[in-house]
Every structure is written in C-alpha cells, then in structure tokens.
UniProtKB/Swiss-Prot annotation:
GO MF annotations, alphabetized: DNA binding; DNA-binding transcription factor activity; protein heterodimerization activity
Alphabetical UniProt keywords: Abscisic acid signaling pathway, Activator, DNA-binding, Nucleus, Transcription, Transcription regulation
Expression tissues: Ubiquitous. Present in etiolated seedlings.
Compartment(s): Nucleus
Protein name: Nuclear transcription factor Y subunit C-4
GO biological process, one term: regulation of seed germination
Gene coding for it: NFYC4
Gene3D superfamilies: Histone, subunit A
Transcription regulation keyword on record: yes
Low complexity composition bias: residue spans: 1-10
Family: Belongs to the NFYC/HAP5 subunit family.
Length: 250
C-alpha cells in the first residue's frame, strides 16, 4: 500500500499543450476598418483646418502691425472721419474730441471689420461656399471671445440650424477647404509671403502695386460692390470727399 501511494504521488505532471518556451498570446480581432479610419481622418482634418486658420490670422495681424509702424499719412483714411466723429459725439457726456481720437477710432474700426470679415470667410470656406452670408458673420462672432459683446444681435437660430444639418451629414460643421480657396492675407511686395493661397484684399489700395499677387475674383467683386454702392463712404486712398482732412471736417 505504501509503495502504491508513493508511486501515485510521484506521477509526472501533465504534458503542456504548448511547446516549451512558447508564450501564450490572445488573438484579438482588429476593429472594423471603416470606423477607426473615419474618426482618425476627421480629427486630423479638423486639426489641420484649425492650424490653417490660425496661420492666416497671424499673417493678417503681423502685416497690420508692420503697416501701422510704417504709416506716415494721417490725412487719408479708409473710413470717413466725419462719420467717426458723429458716432463719438452721440454720447452726451462727450464735449470735445481731440484731433487724434477720430484717427485712432477709424483705424480700430478698420481692423475690426477686416478681422471679422476674415473669420466669416473662413466659416464660408468650411461649408464650401463662395458667398459670404450673414450666418457666416454670426458664426464668427459666436466663435470669437473678443466679439462676445455682439452675441445679443447674432441670429442664433440660423447657426443652430446649420450646425444641426452638418452634424446630420456627419461632417460636424468642419470641412477642409479647397487648396485654392484658402484666403491668405498677403504682405506688400518686398516682404516674405506664403505662396499657394488666396488673399483678402483691401479696398483702399491698388492691389497691383501693393500685393504680391492680385486678389481673388470673389474678393474683387466684394470690394467693387462696396466701392460703388455707398452714398457717403468712399474707399479711395486719394483725398476724396469721403475722407477729408481734419481741417475740412472740423
């Protein structure tokens, strides 16, 4: 009996089904190829689009700073100083206005209009449109913190409807713009410019003498309509009636 018990206790262990030295691995089936690629591709497209927009805005402000530092003509302006003065005097507490104040206000209004236009145009490009609409301006105001004082006058319903429509299509409202439809703001000739893009022109200067390349046809039509449609506002760099000297507008 004792020998039998010893033999039973000394039985060899069962042979492993795996070869010696091999590691046991669990085979996990790969995820569906469609869903992962869509998520990754969409995130990359969105990130690339944000980088493009930030680059365009940085170029715009870099050029504006350079232009402000080099300005030496304080008599001709993009916006009529008479209108600026009239708005400033609408405040009953304002009794007198110095000669420099309307000039600074005119430049500030010009920069405000230009930046808001650029941001609105970017939204139009995201939605693959070549026409600037009021919902593009509303979207630019809603997206930008410094424009939050205009939120109360933004048609929020139109933005919500557009975002819902984009979400239903699976685009999330962000579509990569075409390579030829990216609005770049080009510096004057003689300064480095980023090639391969369009630009947002300025109405008060001759594009052939200022920009490295002529503006796009879309922006040409916008500026031409603005220049020909106003009653009092004149978009000329010369001494037109819309921008008179400070002496003549006092």
């Amino acid at each position: 009996m004792d020998n039998n018990n010893n033999n039973n206790n000394q039985q060899p262990p069962p042979t492993s089904v795996y070869p010696p030295g091999s590691a046991v691995t669990t085979v996990i089936p790969p995820p569906p190829s469609g869903s992962a690629s869509i998520v990754t591709g969409g995130g990359a497209t969105y990130h690339h689009l944000l980088q493009q927009q930030q680059q365009q805005l940085q170029m715009f402000w870099t050029y504006q700073r350079q232009e402000i530092e080099q300005v030496n003509d304080f008599k001709n302006h993009q916006l009529p100083l008479a209108r600026i003065k009239k708005i400033m005097k609408a405040d009953e507490d304002v009794r007198m206005i110095s000669a420099e104040a309307p000039i600074l206000f005119a430049k500030a209004c010009e920069l405000f209009i230009l930046e808001l236009t650029i941001r609105s145009w970017l939204h139009a490009e995201e939605n693959k449109r070549r026409t600037l609409q009021k919902n593009d301006i509303a979207a630019a105001i809603t997206r930008t913190d410094i424009f939050d004082f205009l939120v109360d006058i933004v048609p929020r319903e139109e933005i919500k409807e557009e975002e819902d429509a984009a979400s239903a299509l699976g685009g999330g409202g962000m579509v990569a713009p075409a390579a030829s439809g990216v609005p770049y703001y080009y510096p004057p000739m003689g300064q480095p410019a980023v090639p391969g893009g369009m630009m947002i022109g300025r109405p008060a200067m001759d594009p052939s003498g200022v920009y490295a390349q002529p503006p796009s046809q879309a922006w040409q039509s916008v500026w031409q309509n603005s220049a020909g449609g106003g009653d009092d506002v004149s978009y000329g760099s010369g001494g037109s009636s819309g921008h008179g000297n400070l002496d003549s507008q006092g």
